[in-house]
Amino acid sequence: MNYVGQLAETVFGTVKELYRGLNPATLSGGIDVLVVRQRDGSFRCSPFHVRFGKLGVLRSREKVVDIEINGEPVDLHMKLGDSGEAFFVQELDSDEEDVPPRLCTSPIPWGGLSGFPSDSQIGTASEPEGLVITGRRKRRRRRKPRRREEDAVDSSSEELEAGAESELTLLEKPTPESPSAQEAEEPSSQPKDIHPYSDGECTPQANLSSGDLMSPKSDSELELRSLEPSPLRAESHMQWVWGRLPKVAKAERPEFSLILESMAEAICALPEEPSPSSSPSEAGVDTLSPPVLHPGVRADTFHPAVEAHCEETAVDSPLAAPESKETKTQNSRGAGHPPATKSWSWTTPESHTPSGHPQVSRGKGSLKRNQHLGPSDIYLDDLPSLDSENVALYFPKSEYGMGARRWSEPSNQKLLESPNPEHIAECTLDSVDKIELSLCGGLADNRDISLEKFTQHMVSYEDLTKNPGLLDDPNLVVKINEKHYNWAVAAPMILSLQAFQKNLPESTVDKLEKEKMPRKGGRWWFSWRRRDFPAEEHSSQREKAATRKQQGEKTEVLSSDDDVPDSPVILEVPPLPSSTPGYVPTYKKSLRLSSDQIRCLNLNEGANDVVFSVTTQYQGTCRCKATIYLWNWDDKVVISDIDGTITKSDALGHILPQLGKDWTHQGITSLYHKIHLNGYKFLYCSARAIGMADLTKGYLQWVSEHGCGLPKGPILLSPSSLFSALHREVIEKKPEVFKVACLSDIQQLFLPQRQPFHAAFGNRPNDVFAYRQVGLPESRIFTVNPRGELIQELIKSHKSTYQRLGEVVELLFPPVVRGPSTDLASPEYSNLSYWRKPLPYVDFEALA
């Protein structure tokens, strides 16, 4: 029993250590890179997929990735994203094609870590000229854990870019979280050439060109924001495919789509008012609410209306404090009469009925009411007829769906009137000017969303019908009453108007904004020192900052709710000289290098060790190793799977080798060695995750048989996360999705050679499918089962083994001869054909 206990303890400890190495929080890895030298001397390379674990780099400001090749540092750097992915930064020309916003980024901070002050420097930083700070010691209160989670999830930050205007940022030294601990805040200026924050924390005006490209949100930021209370949170997941950067992919929810469709149908039933033709003083006020469709009338035959002559005004501040109901009523009543080319508001309705318009009597029983739907509902049955004139009058066609529909427009005065004056005030308050949809994003940015940017990404009715899933897009912005909301806040507001004909109370809207709207706040030096400011403070700070830039003045900086200052901090900033905006370069993310950049790496023929490292202040240097292989365009490549092909099974092939058990097929090492001696290159392609790169490479180097090991070659793994790769391979059983994309990309590197792949080894029909997709013939596709039986796909009835295939390796894998050869030019003069005895003549007619 002691032996059994010791064995169980050993197995448990080994599995525990293995899990620690595979934990996504510490999982790092790099996929090998293949560089192919072309016939003209240029180079092509496969993507650089490098990923650092979440705990490998705690602080996102230290995002410069250094590269060493063969032990020597190179003048090439990568940038680290918030989810741990590394990528190159390329500057675009002005005349180059447009780049998707998610691929845009800020330049690499060349200053490195030397540009950041240390902890001692933060506390004793000298005061810059022109900056006067007055204030007393502040008392720091202990933050609650729940408050910390909200700060980590909802806080947003701003990146300081080099330009004509430089901003001064207050730095605060972290202090112990004791009730009596007190520290004095000292100022420090931010170097202009340092970009300490991640891409997801950049404002679009700071890191992009003058074209209205929105700021690309990093992956971890999108993951954190998906943790907010939202019905779509469970549908979000990271998707990282071969040759591309990671992105958030969301699955569509059928039940939610049905709700949206029903809401759209109800919105389609809203009436449209004809253009006024008389003075508004001739009639009273209508109190028409959205009508209700009768079950006998098809809602899809009507379209929501848009008013072509509606007035568009720029939004000063999307987070401005909302006006009270009394203020709204006074403003609407005190407004002057609008011109005839503009639509009438609730307080200035028209009374003239167009000629030929059917009038509905206000007599008893003329209108069908429902006590649950409010006093202003009307059925389509109340209309005398639904001819083309009435349909065009009440339901005109429009280009945009619920985007430009005016909910507050009353119908004709004589069509529906309310005898109760209380309803007038109610409808005046419970009205929405218009609702518009746009994919412009920018709700978390400190700057307001411009009207041009909002209009540029406007969502039309056709866009919504073709892709209802765009409502799940994190960049969706809903404009209601000249205010911007995300869908999580706008959906309850729209539903309340449609179902109850009433607006949500201001307290409810404010609560929704605090819970589900991305907050706008300042970015402090440390990732755990992020502040959240209320909307009122944001608005006042932006107004003061704009005034400060035009003319120098003393600005009062408000602190957050966790710091209670005895006196305000006063900043005296000198006026900045006005400068004309010049050309701002645009940078994009890339995973590949150009031919000139590859030439500067001075790669050796064959394998080149590469180390990607990120240096942090508290954790030291986090390294990730990989290999760059330099091949020629005319090399012949043999593809080999790992799990189930080199190992005896898929699942146990991951576990048993870590326990010291040899779980490889007999004879495969010697077979691969003989094939390699004939001049063939080996490429190992597996659907394992990128975090298992070191584990997989160590296993392939450990495999040995009769003193010879497996040939060296690039190990191409899936760049997705560990659990995504296991789900795709074990649950979905679709590893060919990755392999087809990967092998097709490798095949493009060998152009103009039509087929660089000579043979392939696998263990599943999925592997055979992937190999066929890249043009391999069935005669050179081999599959092996767990019993070690090797099957050639062309002759499936014949079974062999790796040992037997090694005996005839010269026939299936003849030696590769480079350059001109008489054997290849004239096969009849080869050693085999020229010296062999001629075949005997057989008279088939005599045999018949």
Curated annotation (Swiss-Prot):
GO molecular function terms listed in the Swiss-Prot or TrEMBL record: phosphatidate phosphatase activity
Region spans: C-LIP: 587-789
Compositional bias ranges of the Basic and acidic residues kind: 536-556
UniProt short sequence motif LXXIL motif, positions renumbered to this chain: 652-656
Record keywords, A-Z: Fatty acid metabolism, Hydrolase, Lipid metabolism, Nucleus, Phosphoprotein
Motif placement: DXDXT motif: 641-645
Main location: nucleus
InterPro entries attached to this UniProt entry: HAD-like_sf, HAD_sf, LIPIN, Lipin_mid, Lipin_N, LNS2, LNS2/PITP
Phosphoserine: modified positions: S155, S156, S218, S460
Protein name: Phosphatidate phosphatase LPIN3
Native source species: Mus musculus
